[in-house]
Each structure stands twice: as structure tokens, then as C-alpha cells.
Amino acid sequence: MLLAIDCGNTNTVFSIWDGEKFLCTLRTSTHHARTADAYFTWYSTLIKHYGIETDITDVIISSTVPRVVFNLRVFADRFFGCRPLVVGKPDCLLPVQPRVDAGTAVGPDRLVNAAAAYDRHGGNKIVVDFGTATTFDVVDDDGAYVGGVIAPGVNLSLEALHMAAAALPHVDIAKPQAVIGTNTVACMQSGVFWGYVGLVKEICARIKGERDRDMQVIATGGLAALFQQSEILFDIFEDDLTMHGLTVIHRHNKENGTV
């Protein structure tokens, strides 16, 4: 069985796979100081609660938070007796190497999304991931990651408004009833929601124009569904894209004898 771990700035997600069969997902908030023992206590408690029988033999990790990788490595080694693959490290092979400026460090989550998009849908794609940051990743015809765009995330933008302007409250993102808000909360929600609709449309249009071709747009991430239900912005919606990408990269390494 494979344990795939996606550690982002906000949440850490564990996904368990038996071959190609998905079994379950466990989610917790990301804490920089969480120990290997604490990970195991949380993990084993939930596995027991849900009545899931597991026999983990392999672990793969993608983390945008470098500080947590060490303890996740210890967790995998101590409790499952395996050396985990860590996306972005030299010993973790990618199906296709990224084509970006020499010396550029590409976020592992972006490499994982590119691998998943190509495996499921082929090349010539734009992947929009609504996470702590909103990222746009361009996947070439052969599956290579060739660059993209990083914009502030939706919730990050709302939080910045609240933190920087004393009179503005903390609000949650939602589709407003109208563009013109009649109270402060509605005005903030309208600005962020419709602002991001415009941002996605404009950036995707400019990427297509720069590459001089039409491209399918794939959406993933926690808030993608909100925008997909409200506006026709995407051709494909994949809520499990990143986790699928981790299984793709693990399979590639398995086939090449690195695990």
C-alpha cells in the first residue's frame, strides 16, 4: 500500500492507495513543529476510528513547507520501515523533466499537478490550483512543466484586507448575490470573488495567446468548486489532482527501480 502525503502551507493531506485503488483521505492543519510521533498518533487514531486495514509499504511526500519534511521522513522510516520518496529531491525521478530557467526551484506541488494532468488528460493544459496561493501551471505537449503564474490565494487576499484595513472585518469567501454590494461584507466578497473570476479569465487567455494555441484548463484545490459552480472558467475539474499526481510519480519511480 502507498501513503501519499501532500503538505501545503495551510493543510496536510494523507491519502492511502492499494495499488490503483483509492482507499481514504485524512486531513489536518499544517504545523511546522509537529513531531513524527505526533503524526503517527493522529494517523493511527483516525485509521482505527474509520476501521481501515492498512499495510503501508511505500510513502511519497510533496511539501511546500521545507521545515516539515524531516519529521515526515522520520515518521515514514520509524513507523513503516521505508525510505520515502520526496518530490523535488534528486533521488525522486519525474516522468518528464521541467523546462524552466537553469537553477530555478519549482514547487513540488506544481510538478505533481503537471504529472497528474498529463497522465489523465494529455498535454497542452493549464492547471489552476486554488490553494494558499493561486497558481497557473503550463503543461507542454509531452507533459513537461514549462512555467506558469503565481498569484495571491483567495483567502489570503481576504485576510490581507482584514489585517491591513482596521475597519474591514474577517469574512469568508462566497459568491455574492450581486456585483454591487450593499454592506461591507458583500462588498468585500464581491471584490474578491469577481476579482478572481477576472484574474483567472485574463491569465488563462494571456497564456493561450502567448503560446498561440487553444488549451484546456484544469481546476483543482479547495476553492475551485466554488468558482466552477458559478462561472464557466474551466474545462475540467479535478478535486484529487495532486494526490493522483503523487501516485503517478511513485509508479514512475517503481518502474525505474528507485523504490
From Swiss-Prot:
EC number: 2.7.1.33
Record-listed K(+) binding positions: 129
Cofactor(s) for this UniProt protein: NH4(+); K(+)
Highest taxon listed in the record's lineage: Bacteria
Annotated GO biological process: coenzyme A biosynthetic process
Cofactor, how bound (note): A monovalent cation. Ammonium or potassium.
Pfam families found in the cross-reference section: Pan_kinase (PF03309)
Pathway noted in the entry: Cofactor biosynthesis; coenzyme A biosynthesis; CoA from (R)-pantothenate: step 1/5
Residues that hold substrate according to the record: 107-110, 184
Catalytic activity: (R)-pantothenate + ATP = (R)-4'-phosphopantothenate + ADP + H(+)
Binding site for ATP: 6-13, 132
GO cellular component annotations of the record: cytoplasm
InterPro entries: ATPase_NBD (IPR043129), Type_III_PanK (IPR004619)
Main location: cytoplasm
Keywords: ATP-binding, Coenzyme A biosynthesis, Cytoplasm, Kinase, Metal-binding, Nucleotide-binding, Potassium, Transferase
Alphabetical list of SUPFAM superfamilies matching this protein: Actin-like ATPase domain
Stored CDD domains: ASKHA_NBD_PanK-III
Location of the active site: 109
GO molecular function ontology, one term from the record: pantothenate kinase activity
Subcellular location: Cytoplasm
Family designation: Belongs to the type III pantothenate kinase family.
Matching NCBIfam families: baf, PRK13318.1-2, PRK13321.1
Subunit structure: Homodimer.
Purpose: Catalyzes the phosphorylation of pantothenate (Pan), the first step in CoA biosynthesis.
Name of this protein: Type III pantothenate kinase
Gene that specifies this protein: coaX
